[in-house]
Amino acid sequence: MFKVIICDDERIIREGLKQMVPWEDYHFTTVYTAKDGVEALSLIRQHQPELVITDIRMPRKNGVDLLDDIKDLDCQIIILSSYDDFEYMKAGIQHHVLDYLLKPVDHTQLEHILDILVQRLLERPHSTNDDAAYHTAFQPLLKIDYDDYYVNQILSQIKQHYHKKVTVLDLINPIDVSESYAMRTFKEHVGITIVDYLNRYRILKSLHLLDQHYKHYEIAEKVGFSEYKMFCYHFKKYLHMSPSDYNKQSK
């Protein structure tokens, strides 16, 4: 549902951030990249992202100038910088950026920031019923680490195998725990059943594929539903709209 724009004149950095960060786990279904501030500004105006990650030193339009251009927009900013960019960083302080990250980017640090940001985004007042449905559907997926070993192992199995036609038994067999204990413990810690979590996670993953304009029957197969009808049923169950309605809304 959320969108992010990554702006850096070094291709290896912007593509690295795009590919290495598990954006969908943080509800960012669309990731755009730009090689300078001019490209970024065009993308920002066109797509209205919730998050912009930008370098400071860039050709044509630097990061500080970009911040000036988007200061009135409702989006969060993370600045990328080198050790010798302190003067530029001071100039960006007035824009109340979300955080600063030094290059090379520590992905663990970035994911910690994203974890906090996505909770903040999902806690915002909802402007439409569709936003509220999204919040309700994916709220249980926000927490990605629990105190219980078996719960964390089940979550890991879901994220590795959601695209397959798996059962609860398939997910817990590698963990060496009884089915009844696993189901009871998961429900106690997460608040929903393993099957419910699996289906919500599949629907979350399907949003990224919908944004890429895959056919709906292809998406159903790619996220692990045995039938197209089951994909549509669960999509409407959680988001209160059909996949086709979602496509229309996203245009």
From Swiss-Prot:
GO cellular component terms attached to this protein's record: cytoplasm
What main location does UniProt list? Answer: cytoplasm
In what residue span(s) does the Response regulatory domain sit?
Answer: 3-118
User: Record's InterPro entries?
Assistant: CheY-like_superfamily, Homeodomain-like_sf, HptR, HTH_AraC, Sig_transdc_resp-reg_receiver
Q: Please give the Gene3D superfamilies that the UniProt record associates with this protein.
A: 3.40.50.2300, Homeodomain-like (1.10.10.60)
Name where it's found. Answer: Cytoplasm
What molecular functions are annotated in GO for this chain? Answer: DNA-binding transcription factor activity; sequence-specific DNA binding
Q: Does the keyword DNA-binding apply?
A: yes
Q: Where would I find the HTH araC/xylS-type domain in this sequence?
A: 152-249
Q: Which Pfam families match?
A: HTH_18, Response_reg
DNA-binding region, as residue ranges, is located at 169-190, 216-239
Modified-residue entries (4-aspartylphosphate), positions: D55
Keywords in alphabetical order? Cytoplasm, DNA-binding, Phosphoprotein, Transcription, Transcription regulation, Two-component regulatory system
What PTM annotation applies here? Phosphorylated by SERP2405.
Q: What are the BP-aspect GO terms?
A: phosphorelay signal transduction system
Physiological role:
Probable member of the two-component regulatory system SERP2405/SERP2406.
Give the protein name, as stated in the record: Uncharacterized response regulatory protein SERP2406
Lineage of producing organism: Bacteria, Bacillati, Bacillota, Bacilli, Bacillales
